[in-house]
Amino acid sequence: MEYRKFGDTYIVRMDRDEEILAQLKIFAEKEQVKLASVTALGAVKDFTIGVFDTSAKAYHSNRFQGVYEIVSLVGTINTKDGDFYCLLFTF
């Protein structure tokens, strides 16, 4: 992962086979980013997504094998009780 800061904006580039959530957490902790919006595009390989079932009030995960293009990924970086976490959504 590489990143650069331009004013109050960071541009982050992930390397192939890096896990998006793990790398964003490392970045946020290192730079002390406690609240941010995230937008991204690119490609992923072999990934898991979670779908929230509103009736059961539970997440179900789906695993995908292969290479897929990310046309739009949006989300946030947040903190809760001092811990960094991300919520990411793709369309």
Predicted regions and their residues:
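N-terminal intrinsically disordered, cationic/polar leader segments
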Residues: 1-91
